[in-house]
Structures are given as C-alpha cells and as structure tokens.
C-alpha cells in the first residue's frame, strides 16, 4: 500500500476549483462554499436490481416467510454469500415449479455475476428473459441494463429503455431510478421533468442515490421548481440511507444555512463521517474546518491529516497547503501517521 508523506517543498499558490460553488471565495472566511449539487455527481452509474450480498439491507439470512409461504432458502443463501447453495436451491425450485420467476431471476443474477457458477452473461439473459415473461420486475430491470451495456444481449439503447419502463410499470423502484438516469442524460427540459418523476418513485422507496439526484434537481430547479428546503430534506434522507453524496451535500447546506437552519457543528459531524468513509470532498472540507476552527476545535494536525487523505485521492488544496505550511516536523509526522492509519482502516 502506498503511504502518504507530507510535502516538504514550498507550496504553489494555486486556486482550488470551486467544486460546485458559484464565483470566487475566500476559504479563510468561507471554508465550505455553497454547492449547486454538481460536485458530487460525476460518473453516475446505473444500480443493479439485486443488491450484492452483505450490504446493509441484506445481511439477515433467509428472507422471512410472507403470507404463509416457506422461508426463501435460495435467496437466504445468496444473501449470506453461499452461492453454490443458492444455485442448487433455485434450481430445485424451478424443477418443482417451472414458472418460479423469483428463482429464475436469482439464477440469472448468479450467472450474470459469476457467483457459484462460471460467469455467463448469455445464460443470465436467458434466465432473466424467462422470468420477465412471468412479469418479474427485477428480471425486466436487469435485462434493461444488459441491453444498455450490450452484455449477454445485443447492445440496444431503445430496448434497454423499454425493459426499464416495463420494470418500472411493474413496481421496480430501482428500474425507475435507472430510467431517470437515462432521461436526465438527454438534456431535454421535458425529459428532466420526467426524470424527476422517476427519481421521486425511487426516492419514495428510500433509495439513497435517487434521493440525492432528486435533491440536486430541486437545488438547481431542473425539472422541478427550485426549492433548497426540499433539496435539504432529500439529502438528509439520502444520508440516512447511507448515500455519501447526499451526506456531503447535506453537510454543505447545513454549514451555509441554505434550505435548512445553519448548524456548523452538525455540518462538521456529517463531513467527518463522510471523510471517514473515504469521500475526498468531505476530507477536504473537514480539513478546512479544522484549519480555521469552524464547527470543530481548531486542530492543525487533524487539518493536515485530512488534507493529506484528500490529496491522496487527487483533491489538492493550495490554500490548505499554505495555511498549514508552518507545521513543525513532529506535527507533520503525526499528520502522516493519522492519514495512513485512516487509509488502512477503510
């Protein structure tokens, strides 16, 4: 693992990009510039229909029985990472009931990811298609993503969109979110409104990235009336659902009192949490707060440690470098140690 070392040379006095801020700013007076939401939305990718095992919502073992149905042993094994068992149980279910759409979808997922079986996107698409014929929304959603990527099926954007529309109509909030990503990418004002409607469906299902993206639209007034208060509420919910981008945006609004009551200490706590989870923007912002003593007690060593962590991810800050240039050799060593310990803990 590459270790971080504090630079010993003179610091170049270059301006840090605003990262979503409008116009110039003085970090000493305003260490957290307002955001228009674009600083946390680079390279958005579609969400898979089935979450990977061991995520926060999928660590409880077998799915509890519903409506008198037996425990779902196949999905339970999948959620625990027992993929061979999941494959065997799903296969047994299909042998007993050739129209078991959920088992077909699970086999498709196992083949798609190469879990418990040799990865085979073509077979995955075949199983998804069989499940989709039984009106399984998750299978439709996965087929849509495969068509968009040309994975296991011919690449076809129109077909991908149709599958996502069908999945959304059958109640998949993940498909609604992915459909919203397609719509927002066209650049048409009408599609922005349609994208907002799809994001709202997913946001209502507590999908964090959808809450973030809908919040950005409210912050910018795209597809919906501009409303920083609604943006703040969506970012807060997204943060509660574990979405780092939402957490950072909510912290920015909290710090500046935009759409929510100004609270620098709470903002600092959100930044610190996101920084600890590896978000470079949060690492930079909490470093600034430690440097000037806003929301947290002034602590140059902590500021330097977080500045190093952000710089290690490509987000340098000439203002921070200059502000912290008077650190002693011992303070620099402590900052390096803290930064490297945090990297190793993630």
Stretch-by-stretch model annotation:
Residues 8-17:
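Bacterial N-terminal signal peptides
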Residues 20-91, 95-96, 102-105:
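N-terminal leader/linker segments that initiate helical-solenoid repeat arrays
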Residues 63-66, 70, 77-78, 82, ...:
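Short helix-capping/linker turns of helical repeat alpha-solenoids
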Residues 81-88, 118-127, 154-163, 186-198, ...:
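Structural signature of tandem alpha-helical TPR/SEL1-like repeats
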Residues 92-95, 129-133, 165-169, 200-204, ...:
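Conserved structural position within tetratricopeptide repeats
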Residues 103, 139, 175, 210, ...:
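TPR alpha-solenoid repeat register
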């Amino acid at each position: 693992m590459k270790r971080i070392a504090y630079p010993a040379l003179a610091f170049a006095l270059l301006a840090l990009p605003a990262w979503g801020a409008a116009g110039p700013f003085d970090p000493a007076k305003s260490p957290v510039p307002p955001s228009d939401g674009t600083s946390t939305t680079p390279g958005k990718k579609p969400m898979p229909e089935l979450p990977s095992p061991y995520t926060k919502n999928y660590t409880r073992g077998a799915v509890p029985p519903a409506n008198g149905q037996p425990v779902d042993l196949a999905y339970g094994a999948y959620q625990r990472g027992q993929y061979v068992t999941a494959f065997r149980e799903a296969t047994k279910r299909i042998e007993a009931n050739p129209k078991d759409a959920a088992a077909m979808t699970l086999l498709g997922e196992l083949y798609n990811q190469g879990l418990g079986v040799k990865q085979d996107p073509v077979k995955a698409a075949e199983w998804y298609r069989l499940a989709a014929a039984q009106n399984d929304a998750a299978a439709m959603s996965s087929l849509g993503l495969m068509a968009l990527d040309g994975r296991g099926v011919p690449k076809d954007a129109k077909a991908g969109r149709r599958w996502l529309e069908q999945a959304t109509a059958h109640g998949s909030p993940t498909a609604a979110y992915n459909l919203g990503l397609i719509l927002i990418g066209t650049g048409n004002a009408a599609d922005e409104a349609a994208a907002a409607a799809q994001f709202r469906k997913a946001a209502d299902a507590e999908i964090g990235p959808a809450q973030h993206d809908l919040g950005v639209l409210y912050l910018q007034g795209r597809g919906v009336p501009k409303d920083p208060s609604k943006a703040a509420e969506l970012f807060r919910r997204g943060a509660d659902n574990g979405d780092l981008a939402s957490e950072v945006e909510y912290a920015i609004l909290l710090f500046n009192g935009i759409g929510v009551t100004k609270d620098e200490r709470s903002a600092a706590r959100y930044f610190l949490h996101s920084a600890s989870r590896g978000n470079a923007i949060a690492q930079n912002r909490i470093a600034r707060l430690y440097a000037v003593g806003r929301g947290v007690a002034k602590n140059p060593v902590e500021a330097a440690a977080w500045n190093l962590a952000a710089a290690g991810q490509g987000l340098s800050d000439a203002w921070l470098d200059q502000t912290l240039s008077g650190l002693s050799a011992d303070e620099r060593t402590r900052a390096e140690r803290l930064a490297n310990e945090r990297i190793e803990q993630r």
